């Protein structure tokens, strides 16, 4: 039989930063054109502890995400906008101000996402946190989308940061300030040496790092993904059609 390689191995995670695409506005269109979704904070938390041979790359670098953080006029309130559709639409022609998308009147109020008032949680912002504070933090809970994931990530990363860097506190949340008009920014998470901080004041035109995730990888994080061969597809189709024929005969 002729030996043809008809399997396409899909990269579950692909870095879109390059010399020709250094910022968020340049990278996002490439992610979308490659039929991928931008990495989320939750994706990163799933991947970092279980990255196999590439684990040091995942742990020691910062990563931008497709999760957005929207601020109201004046910046007294903010929303965590998971998998922001507005961020997925940006490109090099997108208008921005001070590195943020400016939201038109009424858009902030319409955005779906958990809202927080800075004054209510000011004691938990702009500083490093203990592991227990992270696990109970309402913003980290919103970003992780799953309390068990947040607990696992916090325990493992704190243990490693203690061993490698003698850190007892980390994972602080650092937000934008002085937002005079409603804005939307992309969230990113720092590497472990920088204490795995959450940063919500990303400048979209600075040097950034976006990772595109293959849709198939969302259900199989960390695993290689292969498209089935033509032979496999035909075999399954024939099997399915044969079963259908049997069912029809029974009727």
Feature names for model-found ranges:
Residues 1-37, 43-251:
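A binding-site-centric feature that preferentially detects glycan-recognition modules on secreted/surface proteins
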């Amino acid at each position: 039989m002729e030996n043809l390689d008809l399997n396409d191995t899909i990269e579950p995670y692909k870095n879109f930063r390059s010399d020709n695409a250094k910022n968020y506005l340049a990278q996002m269109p490439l992610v979308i054109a490659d039929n991928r979704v931008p990495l989320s904070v939750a994706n990163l938390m799933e991947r970092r502890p279980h990255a196999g041979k590439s684990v040091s790359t995942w742990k020691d670098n910062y990563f931008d995400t497709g999760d957005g953080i929207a601020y109201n006029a004046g910046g007294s309130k903010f929303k965590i906008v998971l998998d922001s559709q507005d961020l997925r639409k940006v490109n090099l022609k997108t208008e921005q101000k001070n590195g943020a998308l400016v939201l038109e009147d009424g858009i902030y109020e319409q955005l779906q996402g958990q809202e927080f008032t800075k004054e209510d949680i000011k004691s938990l912002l702009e500083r490093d946190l203990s592991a227990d504070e992270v696990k109970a933090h309402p913003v980290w809970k919103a970003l992780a989308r799953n309390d068990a994931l947040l607990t696992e990530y916090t325990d493992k990363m704190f243990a490693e940061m203690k061993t490698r860097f003698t850190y007892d506190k980390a994972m602080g949340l650092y937000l934008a300030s002085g937002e005079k008009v409603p804005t939307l920014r992309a969230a990113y998470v720092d590497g472990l040496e920088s204490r795995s901080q959450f940063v919500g004041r990303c400048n979209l035109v600075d040097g950034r790092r976006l990772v595109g995730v293959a849709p198939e990888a969302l259900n199989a994080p960390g695993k290689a993904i292969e498209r089935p061969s033509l032979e496999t597809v035909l075999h399954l189709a024939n099997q399915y059609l044969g079963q259908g024929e049997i069912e029809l005969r029974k009727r």
